Structure formats: C-alpha cells, structure tokens
Amino acid sequence: MTLHVDRTDRAVSVSAHGVEILCYVHRSGADPFEGPKPYLHPVRTLAGDMVTAYRPHDHRWHKGLQMTASHLSGENFWGGGSYVRDQGYVDLPNVGTMRDEELTAQVTGDRLTITERLTWHTQAGEHWVDELRTMAVCDVDAEDGSWALEFGTSLRNVRGEPLEFGSPTTHGRPMAGYSGLFWRGPRAFTDGEVIAADGQGGPEMMGRPARWLAYVGRHDEVDRSATLLFFDDPGYASGWFVRNTPFAAVNPSLAFDKEVTLPHGETLDVRYRIVVADAAWDRDRLERYAETHPW
C-alpha cells in the first residue's frame, strides 16, 4: 500500500513513501474573523517540500488549500473584511462558518477517499448550505515525482430563497474575482511562473478561462522547485484568479466577474484536480500529463 492515513478528532494526515503529503484539518478552531472552515495544510511534494502557506501576516484567513465563498448573498465565507463598492474592504459582522458534521476516510488500493458532510452558517447563525465534499488522493507516482488530489463538492441551498455567489470583482473591484477553491503558496513562490493550456500563460491569465493552469515555484533552503497543476471543472470554467506577486495564489473561480444564482433546494456541483509535482515542469511536460490523465 502506497498511502498511510493517521486520524485524530480534528484532522486526517496522509503519507506516501514515508512522507506526509497532506493534512486535512476539518475542525480548525479558527478565530471567527478568519471564517472557520476546513483546510489542507501542510501540503507537500513527494520529496517533502512544502507547497502551501498558513495564516500569512498579510491575510491571516489564507490557509493552504481551502473551499471558500468570498461573497454569498451579502455574507462572507472567506474571512477578513468584505469588499464594498466605492468603500473598499470593510470589516462587517458577516463572516460565516463551514462546519464539519461527519467525515469518513477509506483507502482502497492506492487511492484514499475522504467523504465529508458540512453545513454553512452565517455569523447570525442562519443555516444556508448543506455541502457534500469528496476528496481523493491518487496517482502517486514516485518515478514521476507527482501525486494528485481530486476535490469535488455539492453545495445545496437550504436557505429558503436564492443564493448569489459573487466576488470582489462582481462588487466593483476589477481583476479580483476570487471565490471557491483557493490555494495560497509559500512566500518563496512569489514571482513564480504561470503556464496555462493552449499556449497561454503569465499573470495575464487573471480572469481568463483555461482547461488547466500550472504554477511553478522555487523553494527556499533547498535547491529544488515544485509545480502545481490545477484542472478546472470541465463544465464550469468561470475564469482563473491567479497571482504571482505580491504572493502566489491560484483559484478556479466560482464567480469571477458574473454572479451565479443557486435557487433554493438546488445543488451546485463542481470538481477540480490538483497535481503536486517535484521539479519545474515545462509546457511540454504539463501537456503530456494533461493528455495522459484526462479530466
């Protein structure tokens, strides 16, 4: 068996070939202002190099890789201040919580599947969303130096009226359409390389759609690099939020520049794949991986 799993009452740790490659903290105990929610940190390559940041001083609510909703019908399931048109970021009493209700973890062969039920509650205590989240750690390839995380979520509106998913961009801040599954990279990854499908790349990918997008960064302390290859939901593709300065961040946005309405009782289903690889993969290697691992 390639994968080894350790569990506590608040986290699931996954190791491959003797290296802890991720820890999923499903009961975080975070400060309410940081928008308590589950997160993945640390996330590491098979060589043991860290590829996530946790509570950086500029954004304490950034925690590794996590599901978020920056603007949801006036509520903030992101953390910190909310962007208000013509005012900028304002600290409001609207920071919600994603609560873990039940979690199972099962290894079958060389694949670990985590299934979790969550409920989303506003700061005022209203129950708005029932979520079914499924994650899989798979395709661990020691020779290739890579492994993959598949992340799927079903968000069911139980509010009693429609929910509007938005972002700072839908509320007036240009090129800041973050919402949904969000990765914050280590400080050392600042000024990394952004490569995307179909010959695209660079910081100009902000707001553009692409089947996949990769971020290549260099580690401090060791003479190594790492690549994170993100596959967007093939049926969704709102546009990428991506920055390589002043920090490394990637997010296949739920609502980059257009709000998404989820009627009461209906479900929004999205799925993503993130490949964590040792070394700096070039475009040819990224395209080969995408071709041989269709999503």
Short names for language-model regions:
Residues 66-145:
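Extended, loop-rich substrate-binding clefts of extracytoplasmic carbohydrate-active enzymes
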